[in-house]
């Protein structure tokens, strides 16, 4: 909303990372560390309540949540204890703005400073004690006072005003900024940064009369927007705000004196600084650290335990079904959602990316995806960064991007335990440089991101748990045709072939994998991308296949490895399976083949198109291997040499779904979660057009442009607290 002179958010994303929720006894990987005396909430409570908050906000604001991720992790290596006791909760999203409004205007003396939204309360005044200091360092009162919150219904009203102004022929907004960290002092100062401004504190809305001047200036009640408006347009903006039931306050103006001040009614200025003091060049900070080599034991395994390994991997929260998340959030509001999480006739959350259309009838859209690899980053921070970018891109590749990789922009959010132990600052530098170098080689930009560099939880007994250094990469790009997005659901057609396409150009490695995690290991040998140019070529070759409609189904290889990818392609169906032969893969270690998380994808191609597909891949110099074909049998047969293994799809799907059930039963009532677990596979969705359907408006006498009145009148009521009115009106 705060981009340029105003923009339109369309859909949201969310990521949750915690320590193990321990929803069921008997999971050996959850027994490596003892249960701690959690400072505020248990991991299980955080997973449920945090996702409730994201879901509730999206439902109230009218913004669908269409893409997300979950990771749980704990580990002990010698005396080092790792885990997301200090949790990560990331919310993001996609939207767009007009070219006219993409850049902020230049403020001039006399522009009015406007705040739209709710009142000031004692919210978020604990400073950086949540994001910039180890949790547990300060008293619980200070830490809890740092918690922010936002009123979705109020923010929707503020958004309606911004949207209305952006849709006018002449946008009166000079500049706009959201209220986040540091409240008014941050938001309003950035509006007037180029010329200075004076804020009348008596005009700021006060919801709590006991607030001090500092609390009024710096609280983080986040359902507000700050705008710089041309003076002659103030009354017009006020009328728009009144129509939208959005509280609007003219709280100051730009001055031209290059000072930024808050002034009370009695003339006292509790805050008065030169703009240069706030935004001038900061003194250089020198951080001295040294590289510390840490080694992580590799997992030991036996092929004879393959089925046990697989059932364990499928139960990890990062791999398992996310139905407990998707069944409680709106994934379709706006009427512009072209791809959300749930796929196939069983509508299971399997999508690699989320896609929105820009309007109700056009083909253009926006795709978004996520990537992270913190386990790998423990052993090799550079590889962890590369894998995070790679996962985001192999998730995004299924949408036909308007200009291939040139359409893609990334956001990198860094959560790192700096100063928690020697060598972490150096590891962060290595990780950031690796991500920068990889993206430069791919010729994609990373224009935005955030950081939290104190990812350590300290306990009263003196113990501490270090969160793994983590970068979460969000990818977005313009889509040329939302109808061409490839689904991960296998098409039950024996006249098709399944291929593996390698993006890593690296040997198969188990370090940093979900497989290693279930064995309580991390492993020193982690995969990476050995050739960024090759990765780019592979991405663009697959994009060509997508644009030409040559891929029937496709899925990325990430958490859980190749075997999880193959199973997930079958989970959303009620019939059919695969017969897979791995002899053409050079690696002889079956466990590595099935569970390594080297970047790559699996595609299904019609036999009549396979020569064209091969030609495109070979022309691009991209490696591929034929894996097998779909079958009528409800299992996946995997053979390597003389050995053959059978995996029952329906059984493995229940194993995969069980973790969702265990979390769902904690958030639902009256045994609903159990009923859903017992019946989710019994209700395949079928949709068929009438035999005479031609797919044309004219068949039903409908003019999509509404040039001829129908004579029927309908009223759409739009009031505060409502959403979805535009799609209903259309």
Residue ranges and their predicted role:
Residues 1-730:
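Glycine/proline-enriched, intrinsically flexible loops and inter-domain linkers
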């Amino acid at each position: 909303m705060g981009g340029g002179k105003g923009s339109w958010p369309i859909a949201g994303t969310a990521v949750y990372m915690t320590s193990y929720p321990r929803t069921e006894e008997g999971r050996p990987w959850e027994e490596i560390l003892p249960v701690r005396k959690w400072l505020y909430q248990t991991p299980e409570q955080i997973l449920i309540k945090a996702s409730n908050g994201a879901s509730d906000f999206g439902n109230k604001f009218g913004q669908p949540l269409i893409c997300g991720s979950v990771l749980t992790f704990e580990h002990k290596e010698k005396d080092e204890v790792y885990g997301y006791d200090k949790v990560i909760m990331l919310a993001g999203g996609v939207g767009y703005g007009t070219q006219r409004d993409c850049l902020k205007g230049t403020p001039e003396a006399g522009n009015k400073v406007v705040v739209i939204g709710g009142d000031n309360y004692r919210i978020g005044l604990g400073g950086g004690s949540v994001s910039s200091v180890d949790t547990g360092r300060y008293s619980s009162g200070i830490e809890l006072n740092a918690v922010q919150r936002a009123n979705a219904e109020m923010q929707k009203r503020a958004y309606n005003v911004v949207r209305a102004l952006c849709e006018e022929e002449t946008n009166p907004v000079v500049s706009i900024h959201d209220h986040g960290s540091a409240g008014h002092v941050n938001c309003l100062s950035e509006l007037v940064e180029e010329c200075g401004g004076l804020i009348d504190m008596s005009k700021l809305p006060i919801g709590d009369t006991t607030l001090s001047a500092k609390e009024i200036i710096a609280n983080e009640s986040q359902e507000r927007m700050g705008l710089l408006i041309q003076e002659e347009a103030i009354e017009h903006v006020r009328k728009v705000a009144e129509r939208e039931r959005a509280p609007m306050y003219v709280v100051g103006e730009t001055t031209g004196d290059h000072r930024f001040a808050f002034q009370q009614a009695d003339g006292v200025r509790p805050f008065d600084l030169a703009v240069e003091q706030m935004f001038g060049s900061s003194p250089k900070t020198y951080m001295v650290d040294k590289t510390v080599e840490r080694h992580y034991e590799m997992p030991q395994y036996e092929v004879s335990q393959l089925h046990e390994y697989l059932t364990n991997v499928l139960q990890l929260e990062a791999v398992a079904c996310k139905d407990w998340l998707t069944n409680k959030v709106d994934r379709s509001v706006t009427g512009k959602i072209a791809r959300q999480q749930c796929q196939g006739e069983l509508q299971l959350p399997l999508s690699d990316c989320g896609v929105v259309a820009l309007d109700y009838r056009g083909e253009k859209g926006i795709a978004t995806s996520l990537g992270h690899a913190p386990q790998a980053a423990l052993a090799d921070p550079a590889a962890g960064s590369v894998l995070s970018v790679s996962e985001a891109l192999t998730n995004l590749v299924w949408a036909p991007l308007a200009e291939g990789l040139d359409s893609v922009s990334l956001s990198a959010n860094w959560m790192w335990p700096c100063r928690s132990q020697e060598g972490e600052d150096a590891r962060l530098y290595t990780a950031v440089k690796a991500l920068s170098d990889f993206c430069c080689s791919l010729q994609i930009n990373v224009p935005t991101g955030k950081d939290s560099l104190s990812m350590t939880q300290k306990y009263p007994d003196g113990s501490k748990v270090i969160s793994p250094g983590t970068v979460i990469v969000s990818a977005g790009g313009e889509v040329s045709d939302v109808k061409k997005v490839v689904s991960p659901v296998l098409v039950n057609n024996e006249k098709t072939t399944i291929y593996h396409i390698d993006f890593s150009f690296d040997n198969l490695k188990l370090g940093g994998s979900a497989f290693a995690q279930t064995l309580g290991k991390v492993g020193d040998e982690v995969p990476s991308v050995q050739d960024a140019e090759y990765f780019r070529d592979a991405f663009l070759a697959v994009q060509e296949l997508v644009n030409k409609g040559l891929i029937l189904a496709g899925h990325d290889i990430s958490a859980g490895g190749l075997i999880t990818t193959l199973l997930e392609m079958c989970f959303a169906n009620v019939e059919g399976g695969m017969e897979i032969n791995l002899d053409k893969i050079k690696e002889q270690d079956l466990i590595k083949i099935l569970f390594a998380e080297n970047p790559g994808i699996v595609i299904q191609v019609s036999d009549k198109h396979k020569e064209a597909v091969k030609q495109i891949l070979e022309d691009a110099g991209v490696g591929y291997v034929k894996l097998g074909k779909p079958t009528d049998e409800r299992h996946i047969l995997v053979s390597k040499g003389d050995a053959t293994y059978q995996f029952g799809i329906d059984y493995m799907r229940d194993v995969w779904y069980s973790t969702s059930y265990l979390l769902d039963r904690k958030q639902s009532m009256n045994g609903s979660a159990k009923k859903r677990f017992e019946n989710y596979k019994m209700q395949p969705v079928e949709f068929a057009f009438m035999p005479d359907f031609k797919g044309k408006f004219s068949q039903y006498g409908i003019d999509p442009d509404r040039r001829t009145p129908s004579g029927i009148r309908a009223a759409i009521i739009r009031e505060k607290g409502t959403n979805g009115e535009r799609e209903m009106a259309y």
